[in-house]
Regions:
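Gly/Ala-rich beta-loop-alpha elbow adjacent to hydrolase catalytic centers
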Residues: 49-53, 57
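Catalytic histidine neighborhood in serine/cysteine hydrolases
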Residues: 184-205
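Conserved alpha/beta-hydrolase catalytic His-Asp/Glu region
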Residues: 104-155, 159-160
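Short beta-strand/loop motif that positions the catalytic acidic residue
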Residues: 164, 170-172, 176
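Flexible "cap/lid" loop of the alpha/beta hydrolase fold
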Residues: 62-63, 67-104, 144
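Conserved alpha/beta-hydrolase "acid-adjacent" motif
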Residues: 177-183
């Protein structure tokens, strides 16, 4: 079976992908990954990353091109933090506030962040309950969270994406308040072999908003 590597977003583990795994496990060999850009991939893998995980996925495609067959980038951006030439991103002070919160009360800060993931989503209430359940039975790892924030602060892949030659599916929620849809449009335009799918009525986690549609898209993309 084709390997499917799944990389979660900041603050989450592999369980966030469960609705997708339930729909695709019979067709793909599932490989949960963390955010380490040095992870060794199985050959011919489809690498699917969400948010920070999408940035890791792009790094893997650059560093291990012979192992990455295709990319799926969800809620993605080449640069998370605003810059003078990059306005469609998070203000630096928001990351600073999260860093301070992680140092003071990591569990409360993670819950606060999770509450923003589904802002504006048509299915916000059930999605927020699902995400809260994912966070309820695990303690926040302060060092891991801080390292993830540092990567979000420092990573800038804008000059590198032209070297990513793999077929790429960019999936973004129309109402994403954490990462403007303009960032996904930029990626779709600058990646050499990409197409963009916008989920209307969805926010930062479209694969949770519409898991059936997302799984069908990934399945179709894998066989193109």
């Amino acid at each position: 079976m084709t390997p499917l590597a799944l990389i979660p977003g900041w603050g989450f583990d592999a369980r966030v992908w469960q609705p997708v795994v339930e729909r695709l496990a019979a067709e793909f060999a599932i490989h949960p990954l963390d955010h380490a850009p040095s992870a060794t991939l199985p050959e011919g893998a489809i690498v699917c990353g969400w948010s920070l995980g999408a940035m890791t996925a792009m790094q893997l495609a650059l560093d291990q091109p012979e192992r990455v067959a295709r990319l799926v980038l969800v809620g993605a951006t080449p640069r998370f933090v605003q810059a003078p030439d990059w306005p469609d991103a998070a203000p630096p002070e928001s990351l600073q506030a999260f860093a301070a919160g992680i140092a003071a009360d990591p569990d409360a800060t993670l819950r606060q962040f999770a509450g923003r993931i589904n802002l504006g989503d048509d299915r916000a209430a059930p999605l927020t309950r699902r995400i809260a359940a994912l966070l309820a039975d695990r303690r926040a790892d302060t060092a891991t969270l801080a390292a993830g924030l540092a990567r979000l602060r420092d990573l800038d892949l804008r000059k590198s994406v032209a070297a990513i030659r793999q077929p790429t599916l960019v999936v973004h929620g129309e109402r994403d308040v954490l990462m403007p849809v303009a960032a996904a449009c930029w990626l779709a335009e600058h990646l050499p072999n990409a197409r963009l799918e916008i989920f209307l009525g969805a926010s930062h986690a479209p694969f949770l908003s519409e898991p059936e549609r997302f799984a069908a898209l990934l399945r179709q993309f894998a066989h193109e």
